[in-house]
From Swiss-Prot:
EC number: 2.1.1.59
GO cellular component, one term: cytosol
Keyword S-adenosyl-L-methionine carried by entry: yes
Catalytic activity entry: L-lysyl-[cytochrome c] + S-adenosyl-L-methionine = N(6)-methyl-L-lysyl-[cytochrome c] + S-adenosyl-L-homocysteine + H(+)
Domain remark from Swiss-Prot or TrEMBL: The SET-like region, although related with the SET domain is not detected by any prediction method.
Record family assignment: Belongs to the class V-like SAM-binding methyltransferase superfamily.
GO molecular-function term, one example from the UniProt record: [cytochrome c]-lysine N-methyltransferase activity
Chain's role: Methyltransferase which mediates trimethylation of cytochrome c (CYC1).
Entry protein name: Cytochrome c lysine N-methyltransferase 1
Species, as recorded: Kluyveromyces lactis (strain ATCC 8585 / CBS 2359 / DSM 70799 / NBRC 1267 / NRRL Y-1140 / WM37)
Length: 503
């Protein structure tokens, strides 16, 4: 990548400070990746005494790839040149197909645009030059990103076999859409690997860059943008020492080193920014292809193994079928602390998991639900204050209100939680045995890191169960106002959850 970096600095308006270098990263586990470094000896001769930040990189908008690039293509006359005419024709065809409308967003259009440029670059009829073509050929197409959706990695079969519940279905579906579209437009050619490479490279490198809404307003919006050289800066929340912003005068994108916490004893350090303030590990694996290390609280949005759910029965009810009928996604959040792991029991999604195990009938031999005659829904069995049982068709929100909504339902919640913990303990035994038999192809792969992280989490939960230590966040820290629980959304569904959650 050294040659690509030099070309970009010589042939685009991108500027780099004298104290900044770009070379192979020193981050643990970052095999073959690149990073940005700052030389503090040189920095001290360049910065002002009262400066709180220092400019390391400046990237004008003309040296980026965003929706602006695509709008320019669509606005140009097809008579200007053959390349423009071809790309515009293919883009217009993609946008015109109603089956594609659900997939049209800025990031996906950038992917389509670059896939088309890459295909035309292979065609000797067209001669593609300029910054975007160089960046595509020398950076994006030469970067292998092992996202779970990348079917051209050596662990692709293992992702499908052991982690199908974590495969991002919208990603998979969009890649399939592109493959079908390109196959129809370029008959007899197979571009599946190229499409996968471009998609994974773009997804992992694209940044949300602020843009002004106009000259007469202070409002901003964010636009997905590929920013050369800035995309070499790695993520580390524990060692973050830089951030990027826009220069309001020029609209350039600027990487700033933060000078407040500079260690005067070191000569050089790697530059780090934050990709996300809270690290949700499934998101990082799906988008960036790695798991960050941190001493801060991290989150794993854990999805139960469908093989276990589909064969396990609780009081005669198939767990997988129940959650499907109730439109419950069988996932929960594991909060990873330095010395323990806890389950986030403060979110609605966790309450939805508990519905099946409700003990409000006060009889462990009785189940709170009854399968309908059509086999596609469950009726809830309720008991009034006189002990009379009635059967009602309730959705998951109504079940939460009926079972756990009142103050006098605390006893039921505690009994229900006990049942869930018993279920979870059995699950951990099943899952641990299943994944322990995996024959790892590489000790340094993204798949291996993900597998090892799950092993560690399951072992931690099992150890806490066996030593009678609390595994629920609220039960342990709910009354401690100093400890804040991180808030993160669940990642997009796998195809299993997508099918189950469809109305």
């Amino acid at each position: 990548m050294e040659a690509a970096t030099e070309w970009l600095l010589e042939n685009t308006p991108i500027t780099k400070s004298e104290c900044t270098t770009i070379r192979e990263s020193v981050v643990d586990g970052d095999t073959g990746g690149y990073g940005v470094f700052v030389n503090f000896t040189k920095l001290r001769t360049l910065k002002g005494e009262k400066d709180s930040k220092f400019e390391l990189l400046r990237i004008p908008r003309s040296a980026t790839i965003s929706m602006t690039s695509i709008r320019d293509i669509l606005a140009k006359s097809t008579s200007e040149n053959a390349v423009t005419a071809s790309i515009k024709g293919h883009l217009t065809a993609f946008l015109s197909d109603e089956n594609h409308h659900a997939f049209i967003n800025e990031t996906n259009l950038i992917v389509i645009y670059l896939v088309l440029k890459a295909i035309l670059s292979d065609n000797k009829t067209y001669k593609l030059t300029g910054f975007a073509s160089f960046y595509l050929n020398e950076v994006l197409l030469k970067t292998f990103v092992p996202l779970p959706c990348n079917t051209f990695q050596e662990d692709a079969d293992k992702w499908n076999q052991y982690y199908k519940e974590y495969l991002n279905f919208p990603q998979q579906l969009f890649i399939e859409i592109i493959n079908r579209f390109i196959s129809a437009r370029f008959l007899g050619m197979n571009y599946e690997k190229l499409i996968s490479t471009v998609y994974c490279s773009v997804i992992s490198r694209i940044l949300e860059i602020p843009e002004s809404s106009g000259e007469d307003t202070d409002d901003f919006f964010v636009s997905p943008t590929l920013v050369p050289l800035l995309d070499f800066v790695n993520h580390d929340n524990d060692h973050r020492n830089a951030h990027f912003d826009i220069d309001l005068r020029t609209n350039d994108i600027v990487l700033y080193l933060e000078l407040d916490d500079i260690d005067s004893t070191v000569e050089e350090a790697q530059v780090f920014i934050s990709y996300a303030p809270v690290e949700e590990l499934v998101h990082f694996e799906q988008i960036y292809g790695f798991l960050p290390k941190s001493n801060n609280v991290q989150v794993w949005c854990y999805r139960f193994d469908e093989d276990f759910l589909s064969t396990y029965h609780y009081n005669g009810i198939n767990v997988s079928h129940f959650y499907k009928c109730m439109r419950v996604r069988p996932s929960f959040q594991i909060l990873i602390l330095p010395s323990e792991v806890l389950i986030n029991d403060c979110i609605v999604e966790f309450g939805e998991l508990l519905i099946l195990f409700s003990q409000h009938l006060q009889d462990p031999k009785k189940i709170s639900f009854q399968l309908s005659e059509t086999n596609d829904s469950y009726c809830s069995i309720l008991k009034d204050k006189c002990g009379t049982e009635t059967t009602k068709l309730l959705d998951k929100e109504e079940c939460l209100e009926e079972f756990f909504g009142e103050h006098d339902e605390i006893e039921n919640y505690e009994k229900t939680l006990k049942e869930f913990k018993s279920f979870l303990s059995k699950y951990i035994t099943f899952r641990r045995e299943k994944i322990s038999s995996i024959n790892l192809l590489s000790q340094n792969s993204s798949f291996t890191a993900f597998w090892q992280k799950e092993i560690n989490l399951l072992d931690s939960l099992k150890g806490q169960f066996e030593s009678k230590k609390e595994v629920m966040w609220y039960e342990k820290y709910g009354n401690d106002e100093k400890i804040k629980i991180p808030t993160v959304p669940f990642p997009p569904p796998s195809w299993i959850d997508y099918e189950n959650m469809r109305v």
